[in-house]
Amino acid sequence: MKKLLLTASIICLASAGLAEENPTPVISNSDTEIKLEGFYLFESGYIKQDHLILFDKNVTDNRKKLGFYTEAAFAATISKTINDVIAGAKIVLQPTTRVKTSASYNGSHIFIETSYGKVELGSPVDASAKLRVTGSQVTAGTGGWYRYALLDGQYMRYNGLKPDFDTSASFYLESYSNSFDQINEKTEKARRLNFFTPKMKGFQAGISYTPDTANTGGNKDINNLTLESSGRNGVSVSRTGIKTVSLGNGETMTINQNIRDAFSAGLTYEHEISEDADLKLSVTGEYGKPARRLVHAKMEGTKVIEVLNTYKLSNLKAYNLGAVFTYGNFSCGASYGSLGKSLTAKEYYKVGRDTYYYNGAVAYGQGPIKTSLEYLKTSRYKNTVDAVSLATEYKIMPGLLPYAEISHFQAKGKPVYYPEAPSKTTRGTVGLIGTKLKF
């Protein structure tokens, strides 16, 4: 019943918005404005992948090869303007399906905007994520092949340990530390302070400060791995940003990928070369200190009985360079990003410590139809992913966008703790058909 009411509400709001060229419903008076915006995605995915064993072949609990996926977002922005100062709040509601967490739906926060710039208080999306440019920004479809692929299945493991892979061009602060999958409460990611300058002659800059990436919207602290004698038992309940891997013989490595005193910044430049040609350039980066050390421990069940050693993790240092060029109906985009040796230690990351990615895409749009081709290459600790995606979409009306997409991928690598392990490869093809609704 709740899902039916939510669907009816979205359809009613969307119908009002889609009738206009600007599909965002707005309620306003002389100095107060309320803007409603939302997104819903329905997608069906089919996959064919080699070297999958037993239940690794299942896309869902009881079905191989075929699965459905949904994603949603709904937000209300309330703002008031007094003497050229805009103050307000954006409140993002938790939907009944998987929440969309892109920078375009910049979660719940307070904002104050003047002619000198915009301040965001409590935003879960940092400046580098909002200002970063990648090749995928010009593509059709969703690029969501990774939702159906299994790159670390049983065949790819060694001594029970999984290899690490990257499937997108992203940074630590938005993907590695805190995601909704790692948070028990229905909250957003870490709280931040953001500042963005106004656009001046095509330039815009932004900077963010995050005191602790474990400080999410629903908790104020987090307990790391400790001994029984300290009065705290084991690891934190929420385990936000923490993963523990088993090395056998009762030994584990606990890696806390949370960051303290994290800064992210970005600079973009937009230039209209001619009536038909536009260029956008971006440089973004992140810096921060690891919250804790890597812990090598002896465990009995879920209890730590002895800490064998601790190792220092390297600082977070990451950057991304990106560009998008548009000429008439053609668009192309490219980006390169490096995370270096961020949050690694040689005692565990024995195969390799560097992470980088690059991607490029070309797109052509004619009327309501858009078609694109994208290539992505990632390397995480010398484990590589190559993916090529061909996608097309058709705009039925403003805000309603059916699409189809086919992707071929290859992942090659081994667990980072075992340099003696053989490097293994898995390949596959994913077909997607879906519909996006924005209002």
Swiss-Prot record:
Signal sequence, renumbered to the chain: 1-19
Organism of derivation: Rickettsia felis (strain ATCC VR-1525 / URRWXCal2) (Rickettsia azadi)
One Pfam family matching this protein: Porin_4
Descriptive protein name: Uncharacterized protein RF_0053
GO molecular function, one term: porin activity
Lineage, top ranks: Bacteria, Pseudomonadati, Pseudomonadota, Alphaproteobacteria, Rickettsiales
GO cellular component: membrane
Keywords of the record: Signal
SUPFAM superfamilies linked to this entry: Porins
Superkingdom: Bacteria
